[in-house]
């Protein structure tokens, strides 16, 4: 199977998992990126089965609306049963690196609200130790140099992501050459740097369920 076929398979598996648990008042949290887009496309076939969605980015909101799925502001939603999103890396404990698409802050907020966080990914994203994929950090622009110096002290090699502004108007620094053996601790350390909005480690609030696309089919991992 190609990578696109694996993404479509896990997207469909996520729809199959949540659909029996949805009703006409349900609102679904939706992530950002190519795998999340596959999920949106699969979910759209069942848009009569739920009320609408909360989007983690402007791009996701536009895709949902294009399918005729109502999009709600998170502040107007009191309960979010599911959040479905992809990942750049996952370990076996379902700690994630996310943010390759620069939507990490809004993704992390929606994930924090959701009762169940379902991560969907192809098998290449499952790794023994996080960090081969550069760790994105969203930063207030005036703090870029300060944050970069602090990231060096933590052992990383920070690289400014040229030409990218987040939906929140901030910049991204990608931290290379990190072997992340304690993701919960590192997430807190980076978030404590003045000028950091958040970083792409999802370890304090990891995924609850990982649907992993492999050549043998979709595998389900839980914490």
UniProtKB/Swiss-Prot annotation:
Catalytic activity as recorded in UniProt: aldehydo-D-ribose 5-phosphate = D-ribulose 5-phosphate
GO molecular function, a single term: ribose-5-phosphate isomerase activity
GO cellular component, one term: cytosol
CDD domains attached to this UniProt entry: RPI_A (cd01398)
Active site: 107
Protein family membership: Belongs to the ribose 5-phosphate isomerase family.
Name used for this protein in its record: Ribose-5-phosphate isomerase A
């Amino acid at each position: 199977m190609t990578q696109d076929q694996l993404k479509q398979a896990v997207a469909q598996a996520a729809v199959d998992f949540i659909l029996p648990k949805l009703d006409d008042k349900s609102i679904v949290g939706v992530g950002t990126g190519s795998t999340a887009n596959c999920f949106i496309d699969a979910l759209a076939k069942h848009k009569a089965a739920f009320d609408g969605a909360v989007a983690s980015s402007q791009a996701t909101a536009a895709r949902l609306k294009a399918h005729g799925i109502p999009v709600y502001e998170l502040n107007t939603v009191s309960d979010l049963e599911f959040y479905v999103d992809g990942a750049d890396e996952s370990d076996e404990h379902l700690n994630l690196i996310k943010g390759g698409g620069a939507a990490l802050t809004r993704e992390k907020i929606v994930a924090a609200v959701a009762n169940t966080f379902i991560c969907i990914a192809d098998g290449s994203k499952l790794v023994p130790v996080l960090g081969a994929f550069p760790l994105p950090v969203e930063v207030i622009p005036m703090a870029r140099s300060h944050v970069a110096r602090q990231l060096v002290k933590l052992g990383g090699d920070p690289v400014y992501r040229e030409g990218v502004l987040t939906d929140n108007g901030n910049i991204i620094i990608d931290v290379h050459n990190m072997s992340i053996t304690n993701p919960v601790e590192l997430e807190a350390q980076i978030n404590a740097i003045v000028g950091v909005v958040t970083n792409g480690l999802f370890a304090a609030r990891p995924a609850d369920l990982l649907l992993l696309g492999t050549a043998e089919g979709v595998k389900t991992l839980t914490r």
